[in-house]
């Protein structure tokens, strides 16, 4: 069996979690949990899992998904999507709960506290694309070279951190963009560490 894609593995983990709670979710509920645009996207994942022998589909039943085993609660995270983060020119903070998604813990290097949607292309050389959902682990501290979500004068951006002897720079990973030099009198704070991403679709 070929390895599961991250999204498909997350759907399987969600189904296992629901099965442990005695629930067989409908396609509409799966689509809502993962932010799919339609039930058809959920159907494709469910059908692929069934063909791989990881779940069973009971015919002619709205809630006809049967999961042989269980993943355990630690395998799943229910993460809030809190707004946008700029991969380009910093954008004004619009932090506020938009939705929540069930995701597999294994997708992230650190345990994320929330997700932000990327806007822009300044981090494409690090594999972070416009529209991606990035996991953010809350932290006020970061090492030189880490990818951080930072607040500069009230605006939010995702960049690589460079701590110079005299000033901090936030480095893009796209030659079309210039580094952000943090002025000495700027209102600057590290909001968190990048710990992985989800590419939907």
Swiss-Prot record:
Molecular function, one GO term: DNA binding
Entry keyword Lyase: no
Swiss-Prot/TrEMBL GO biological process terms: DNA repair; DNA replication; negative regulation of DNA-templated transcription; proteolysis; SOS response
UniProt site positions, description: Cleavage: 87-88
Keywords carried by this UniProt record: Autocatalytic cleavage, DNA damage, DNA repair, DNA replication, DNA-binding, Hydrolase, Repressor, SOS response, Transcription, Transcription regulation
Record: active site: 122, 159
Catalytic activity: Hydrolysis of Ala-|-Gly bond in repressor LexA
Enzyme category, top tier: hydrolase
Entries under InterPro entries matching the protein: LexA, LexA-like, LexA/Signal_pep-like_sf, LexA_DNA-bd_dom, LexA_repressor, Peptidase_S24_LexA, Peptidase_S24_S26A/B/C, WH-like_DNA-bd_sf
E.C. no: 3.4.21.88
DNA-binding region: 27-47
Coiled-coil ranges from the UniProt annotation: none
HAMAP family attached to this UniProt entry: LexA
Similarity section: Belongs to the peptidase S24 family.
Subunit structure: Homodimer.
UniProt function note: Represses a number of genes involved in the response to DNA damage (SOS response), including recA and lexA. In the presence of single-stranded DNA, RecA interacts with LexA causing an autocatalytic cleavage which disrupts the DNA-binding part of LexA, leading to derepression of the SOS regulon and eventually DNA repair.
Protein name: LexA repressor 1
Protein's gene: lexA1
């Amino acid at each position: 069996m070929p390895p599961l894609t991250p999204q498909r593995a997350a759907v399987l983990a969600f189904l296992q979690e629901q099965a442990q709670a005695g629930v067989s979710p409908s396609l509409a509920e799966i689509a809502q949990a993962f932010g799919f645009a339609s039930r058809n996207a959920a159907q494709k994942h469910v059908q692929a899992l069934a063909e791989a022998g990881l779940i069973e589909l009971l015919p002619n039943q709205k809630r006809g998904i049967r999961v042989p085993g269980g993943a355990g609660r630690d395998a799943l995270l229910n993460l809030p999507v809190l707004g946008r983060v700029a991969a380009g020119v910093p954008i004004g903070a619009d932090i506020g709960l938009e939705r929540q998604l069930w995701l597999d813990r294994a997708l992230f290097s650190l345990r994320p506290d929330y997700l932000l949607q990327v806007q822009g292309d300044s981090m494409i050389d690090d594999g972070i694309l416009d529209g991606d959902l990035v996991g953010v682990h809350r932290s006020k501290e970061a090492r030189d070279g880490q990818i951080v979500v930072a607040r500069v004068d009230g605006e939010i951006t995702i960049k690589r951190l460079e701590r110079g002897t005299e000033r901090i720079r936030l480095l893009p990973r796209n030659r079309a963009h210039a580094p952000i030099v943090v002025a000495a009198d700027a209102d600057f704070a590290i909001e968190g560490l990048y710990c992985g991403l989800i590419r939907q679709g």
